[in-house]
């Protein structure tokens, strides 16, 4: 599960499911994170500030689904005394397509991981693209 320190990060179109976790996304120490269109199922602390009383951080969360979650779903800024605030990260410097959050469990469990030998008649947004037939793949 991602933890961000000293930078900007973007988590989108992810499926988080782990009933024994401490957190799904942790943001701390001069970090700013954009959390978009993810599906959180059976997790504690879907997104949380890691050191809210010691260092500034920022979380922007939008379009996510929280299914049987508990704990922190922190958003906004945390700025302890004596520190400047961290700017929100809301405009990644690249283009991307957001899937509907309710479709994420299906898309991730169906299209993530080793799928090179499977026949597909549809291409999901963000699905891996096969550029060579499986027969010609290098085998180790």
Q: Could you say what each language-model-derived stretch is?
A:
Residues 3-6, 10-140:
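Extracellular beta-rich repeat passengers
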